[in-house]
Amino acid sequence: MKKPIPRIGSRRNGRIGSRKNGRRIPKGVIHVQASFNNTIVTVTDVRGRVVSWCSAGTCGFRGTRRGTPFAAQTAATNAIRTVVDQGMQRAEVMIKGPGLGRDAALRAIRRSGVLLSFVRDVTPMPHNGCRPPKKRRV
């Protein structure tokens, strides 16, 4: 029986080089997605490849505590700690969503020692798109 020739870089034989190896990242983009239920902080390089991420849920907060400002602050601190060790000095911040953790995450990012180029609010706003859900009657 003929042996199959392994394709280089195929999904079956794994990735050739790990994306999360210790490369030096001088500049990056920090994405903060703050919903009412959770806060997700993702750190990418300039090309958009994910270097590090953390959410309030992965930090150990469960239930309604995930949406608190303290949980967002902890998630931002954990996500940035790894990239500061990899040498990130400058970053751009993109904040999305209406959650309570927006300001707390930004405060934690400012305290981390990374110089911020700019802070941009990228919350999606409809130009009167879909009909919103009906009002809650409690």
Swiss-Prot record:
One of its GO terms (cellular component) is ribonucleoprotein complex. Its main location: plastid. It comes from the Eukaryota. SUPFAM superfamilies: Translational machinery components. Keywords: Chloroplast, Plastid, Ribonucleoprotein, Ribosomal protein, RNA-binding, rRNA-binding. One of its GO terms (biological process) is translation. Part of the 30S ribosomal subunit. The keyword Plastid applies. This is Small ribosomal subunit protein uS11c. Belongs to the universal ribosomal protein uS11 family. Residues 1-23 are annotated as: Disordered. Signal peptide: none annotated. It is found in: Plastid, Chloroplast.
